[in-house]
Amino acid sequence: MNQSKNRPAMTWMFSLLAATAVLGGCATVETRPTAAVNASNPLVAQAGHLARNNADLSGAQRTENERQIERLLSQLDNAALAREAEALPVGDPLYNFVGRQLMQRGLPLPRPFDQTSNWRYQASAQRPPADSDGYRPPLKLAVLLPLSGSLATAAAPVRDGLLAGYYGETRRRPEIIFYDTNGTAGGTLAAYDKAAAEGNDFVVGPLGRDEVSALFGKDALPVPVLALNRGNVAPPSGTVSFSLTPEDEGVAAADYLLERKALRVLAIGGGDDSQRRAIAALKERLGARGAQVTDTIGEGTADLAPFASKEGGIDAVFLAVKGSAARGLIPKLALAGLADKPRVATSQLLSGTGKPEQDRVLDGIAFPSESWTSGGVRGLPPAPGVAAGLPTARGPAARLFAFGYDAWLLSAYLERLAGRSDAFVAGATGVLRVDGFGSVLRTPAWSTFSSGVAVPLADASRR
C-alpha cells in the first residue's frame, strides 16, 4: 500500500536535481503594501445579505448563492471593491468573497482572509517554528496518488515533480511516504485512514476528481489535506484544493481579455469535454464582469464572417482547440476580418505543434503556460535539462511535473499563505495564493508563438 522514500533509482536522480539547482529549494514568498479607504455600495449590501445566509445552504443552492455573490461583486470596479473590503469588519461573512475578488484581480487585501468555522488552516503545533520566509514543512508527509490503475500515467510526473522539490530543498524536510489510492474512491479513503493511523501530520493528494470528492465527503479529516483536484463540494475546514483544470484556464483567459478591454468575444472550440468546460468558464467569468461571449462555434465552422459581422463587432477571439485545428482556423479568421483582433487560447494550443515552419501561423496567439517551462523558476533546473534526463518531465508531462513541484511548495508554505494577506509563492505553474475558502488561486505565466516557436509573452500581466 505504501512506498517509502528510500528508492535508489529515484534518490540519485533527485539528488542530481538538487545539486544542479542554482538556488535549490528556496521559494519566493513576497509581500505587497496595502492602502486603507472607506466606502459603501448597494451592490455590496445585497451581496452581504446573500453571504450571511450562505452557511445555511448546501449543494446546488449554495453553489448558486455563491455565484450570485460573485456576480454582484464583479460589477464593482477595482477602486470600489478595494474601498468596500477596507470597510468590512473582521468576521463579516462577505469579506472572504470580496477578498477573493481582489486576489483574482491582482489587488492587495487590506487584511488576511477571515479563518471561520467553515474553513481554517492550522499547522501541527509540533512542527519547528517557520523560517523567515515562511517555510514550515510537515514533520511526516503522506502523498496519496494513483500509483496503479487508470490514472497511474498522470500520477508519475506529479510524483516526480514533488520529489524534485523535496530533494532540492536543503533545509529540514519531512519523512515522506507514498500511498497508492488505486485511482478509486474506496482506495483513497483506505489510503487516507492508513496515513492518519501511521502518524502523518499532512496529506498531499488524492489526484482524481472522484477521489477528491469522496475524501471531502468523509465525516472527519483529522489530518489536513492538500487535494490535487477540485471536488464536487467545497474543501472542508483544514483542507485545501489545488488543480490544473480547464475551468481555471477559461477564467484566466477571461481575466486576460478583460484587462485588455475586450467586451465581446467570439469563442471557438473543439468537441472534447475539457474544451467545453474552458469555454463555459470563460463565458461565466466574462458575463459576471459585464462582457460577453457573442457566439460559441465549432472548430470546423467553414465561414466565420457571419459571426464577425454581427452588430457590435468582435473585440477578441478565444480558441479552445489544439494546435492542428488552430492552424486551420487562422486563415478563416483573416478572411472574416478578425486577423488583427487579440487571440487567446488554452494550453491545448501546444498539442500538435513543434514544427516552426508550420506553426508560424500561430504567431501572436496568447495562451496560459507554466512559469518553469516558459521562462524558468527559482529552485528548479531549466526544463530542457530536466526533460533530457527524466521522461516524466518531457512534453505534455512537464505540466504535471511542475504541478507536483508546486504541491511540495504548498505543503511547506501553506501556513504562511493561509495566514497573511500579502503572501504568495512563485511556483513552477505560476504565482500561487490561497483564498479564504481553501482554494489555491493560480496566476499562470503567459506565452505566445514567435516565428513558430513558443516563447514567454513579455507584456502579459504577471500579478
Sequence positions of predicted segments:
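C-terminal motif of bacterial Sec signal peptides marking the signal peptidase cleavage site
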Residues: V22-G25
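Extracellular/periplasmic periplasmic-binding protein-like sensory domains
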Residues: G287, I314, I330-Y405, G419
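Short beta-strand elements at the ligand-binding edges of bilobed clamshell
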Residues: V233-Y256, D359-S371
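Periplasmic-binding protein-like
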Residues: A195-G208, L226-L228, R264-G269, G312-A326, ...
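Segments of small-molecule ligand-sensing domains
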Residues: A383-A458
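Bacterial signal peptide processing site
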Residues: A27-E30
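Beta-alpha junction/loop-to-helix N-cap segments that form part of ligand/metal-binding clefts
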Residues: T153-P157, G168, R172-V233
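An alpha-beta-alpha
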Residues: T239-I297
